[in-house]
């Protein structure tokens, strides 16, 4: 209900200016405008208008101004005033809508937005007041037939917007039938806007009646696949608009559908066509195509000589007459109900009854079927006379006649009901002919399959059951099988217990009952989940007592398979027929014939897949109904049954949606056990299971509720322990209904809810929980209000008020200080006191106006507790927010240096000196971080310089004890924590390029873990450029390792997984945000990926890896910003031609995808950077390599240049002119294409910018070789120097590259001599003796100081990086005139780059070096 309903009606006529009439009739347009502005102001200030006042004259004058006034300003104001009248009067305005629509449509020819936009708004509001679009059908069709394209376009858009408000159950069939062919014609209009508008209108129609009906109405136009695809897209948009409108206007409790007139009379804000917005949200089937067909009078088109031929003695002539009639009926499925078909039906049934030829009789049956289908309920008067004849003819066994008779009896009875023909059916069941009995039983089976316990005619059923029971003992096997099928279908329709009561005579016959239950199960399988849900719901409605509470009705179970039927029989045994008491169903025999009620195997109960993400995505896109209700609706339950039925086993589904709460308990026990046996299946379906739990919250059985809360606790604890993220949709679908249970009277139930809320607080954090807690304060239940306030107080006390400041907690809680309930009052006061502790007097301002009594209560509590303003201390930071969590690990985590190998055995240590360690089995390892990179080594390495402890790491430990479910997460000691998160991520990204496979893989797993955390992935996204560069370096190393014959599958899998997740992106309103990657980075990653594909993909073992890399390259095209992407691709092609890497063809193929992306994204391009890349390519290819101008690569690049020019226009030429030495081919191509564009009058699609890419700080990717790692280990860990030296010797002996690197180190590094002596000493004695400990300390200090300061960097050059771009960096117009100035951005580019250290870091270095000198 909107605010309009609470406003008072206002008569605006007395509020108009005294000279209003004079001004509105003035000849000066300024005065007329002044009058209209005054009227508009009054209408704006008074949104609800009096329905007793007469506004006809005023609205008529506005209509005249809109139609005749020559001034566009006056017309626009008149349109706005009419819209305000429509909004203010709503349903009472409908009488004015008819005359106004033609005027509005006629004025739509105006293109100026000043008038067009008010007209659009006016038409929307006027249309909402109409009871149905059919009332304005003629005006709409006339407007669509106008020659002016603007009128046609705006009218079609108006129709589309109005149809977006219509629910399928209230579809204006006549209007749709008339307008769809017109829209179909307009889809071929010469004007593109008219075509798009008509397609949008057809999309709105398709949402209502379905695509099949739209195709039928469009006829030949539906063969255009492109148009139908667009219509489908607009249909999806219409669905979203309808859902949005429905959510906006739906009242708290969805009422049943009402007629448009009733809605309009009640002042519904949406008017006639929008009445669907407040109707029930039950799923609506696709519209019946029959409703949109033209009625056909078959009697006036009867074949020539029909009357004569039908009476002919020759069966061929009778057959020919009936074939002509059948062809006519088949071609026109909908018959005119006004015609009199009595004589024709009588003649056909006579032929069916008397004709001796089965071909003629079969044709007569088909004709009767066609007439019944064409007339539908209008055929009902003939059903009683035709039905006995059909049953009698069932004695014919031949399919030629039998099959048409089956279709005929179904069609005839569909026009009436089973009760009307009950006596006829009963008579047919008593016939001695077995074929008649068989077909009659099968007919009943088909009837029962369409009925439920509500629609089943019970009296008729009771009269039919004895005959069916009798048939179950018939000597003919087909009769017996047919009767079992009928009784199985009956059991499906009315439920098992009522069926067993009706079948008491054969209840003790296990053979018969097993056959019936077999057909019962087949009937359930044929019906499908949706039909079963409706069926069982009707069963429970029929069984429910008259005074049943509404919540009981809104949670119907699903179905009743055989595995629960034994339980039902044991709980409520049926009374056997008299004389059969001793033949009660034996328990043992049941256990042999039927499966006992035992929980299925845990691993089969729920599927383990990734459908959860898709469900959440569809719910965001409104493709699924939002889980938001005051009481569960049929649509919500049906949707949950469908979704859960796709994941759960049938036996579990039957227990979850059973009527008996004992079955719920059995299902809950099975699900709780899954937490131990198959936790991943619970996590994969946690959203659905928690929704099912919310349905149980609306029930009152204490035992079931306790068990449900136990399952909820198990699920949320599993989510917390495995650090599985919970989406906002998942939380909002569960928590509000969980909080309802905080108001329960039983303390144990409230305690369970508190535990669950505490766990959820750890998972999602107070910021997400608090809005739902505040909303729960609206409850009338005092316990619920007090419990929610206690949780809010806990949040504020522990996390402070700052994270919750935006939620206005104080203002929401303040009114509860005056609550009637003492517990609520105390809890509210405590919340405000907690706020005062953090905010001080600002709390009073945030709380707003409070009653003096309430304020004094809070002040008294503050004084009594002695709380000082601003004394609050955050005891624990809010959990669930943007941080990086570490999964719990088994065993201790140990410190190890950045380059230590993982392959070393675990050797606990005991500290003996500052440098040396002695192994001892009794000392446990200690914990610390692992990596120490140069970027931030001063924050950690210098602090540990005084007491260096080198500890050998153990083997990696699994972080999850269960083999069936493992988190894809590294368990190393360097797992990223919430402390120094940014630095840790930076270290991990740098380690991606490590030459040690285990270090690189570990870093990739850590980055992947962060990317999987929605709250933290932005920390990696903004470093995407560095991740790509590090990955490119690692892929180059992978190629070398692969060529050397080593296994690279682990590294490759980790790398591709990380990059795929990185490029999956974050979902935004407009799709995926482009990743920040510079052209050089794009070139590097593209080149590395393609080289891997070529070198690895040619081998059998690398085929799978190459496929992953191929998809990775395609994903990269979709995610990178277009200018950087094109520049990177051109640079990669240039480099490939220069170095002959063999990837040129692949780069060309990838580049073609850039054109497709340009069409999709329509983004601006940076012409300066792009032209620079093209120029470099042409210089390389044409000047340096002297390639032919007709070479395929040259032509491909020419094509891309043409696309850029068509997109950007003259900006490309300006960019080329700024080049100091543009290549001749480049300028020639640009001039040629621009000349062509001028000749053909082609405008640029999206003129771009000349700005070059802003220079960014270069983040170097540190790649430490294996030689460097080994040498660092020797200097860090002198106690294990011998082992490290052995590793170094093995490494330098393995390849010439390692040997050369080692020699280079000895030559250039200050520590080279020391390393050389240590290696030589170890080679001679196999051990190293350190006599002077202070020398060792000095060496270690020097090594750490060198590691801290990093390598010496060369002085940055003072000239720009690219001399060809000098004129774009130095601003002066031209350079010869006046002094040139250097912009700030360009100044940064040419400024020398020097290493800088903070004062603290320099002080630490000086202090350390001084201490070393003193030794």
Curated annotation (Swiss-Prot):
SMART domains linked to this entry: TOG
Intrachain S-S bonds: none
Residue stretches of biased makeup (Low complexity): 255-276
Changes seen on gene knockout: Maternal-effect embryonic lethal with meiotic and mitotic spindle positioning defects in one-cell stage embryos. RNAi-mediated knockdown results in meiosis and mitosis defects in embryos whereby embryos have one or both polar bodies absent, more than one female pronucleus and display irregular female pronuclear migration, which leads to delayed association with the male pronucleus. RNAi-mediated knockdown results in defective mitotic spindle positioning and rotation in which spindles are established in the posterior side of the embryo and on the wrong axis.
Keywords: Cell cycle, Cell division, Coiled coil, Cytoplasm, Cytoskeleton, Meiosis, Microtubule, Mitosis, Repeat
Residue numbers spanned by region TOG 1: 1-250
Comp. bias intervals (Acidic residues): 562-572
A molecular function GO annotation: microtubule plus-end binding
Biological processes per GO annotation: cell division; centrosome duplication; embryo development ending in birth or egg hatching; establishment or maintenance of microtubule cytoskeleton polarity; meiotic spindle organization; microtubule polymerization; microtubule-based process; mitotic spindle organization
UniProt repeat feature HEAT, residue ranges: 30-68, 95-132, 135-172, 179-217, 339-377, 381-418, 420-457, 464-502, 706-743, 764-801, 804-841
InterPro entries linked: ARM-like, ARM-type_fold, HEAT_type_2, TOG, XMAP215, XMAP215_CLASP_TOG
Region (TOG 2): 251-530
Location in or out of the cell: Cytoplasm, Cytoskeleton, Spindle pole; Cytoplasm, Cytoskeleton, Microtubule organizing center, Centrosome; Cytoplasm
Domain comment, as recorded: The TOG (tumor overexpressed gene) domains are arranged in the N-terminal region with each domain composed of six (for the most part non-canonical) HEAT repeats and forming a oblong paddle-like structure. 3D-structure analysis shows the presence of additional HEAT repeats that are not detected by sequence-based prediction programs. Intra-HEAT loops are positioned along a face of the TOG domain and bind to a single alpha/beta-tubulin heterodimer. The TOG domains seem to be structurally and functionally polarized.
Family: Belongs to the TOG/XMAP215 family.
Name used for this protein in its record: Zygote defective protein 9
Annotated gene: zyg-9
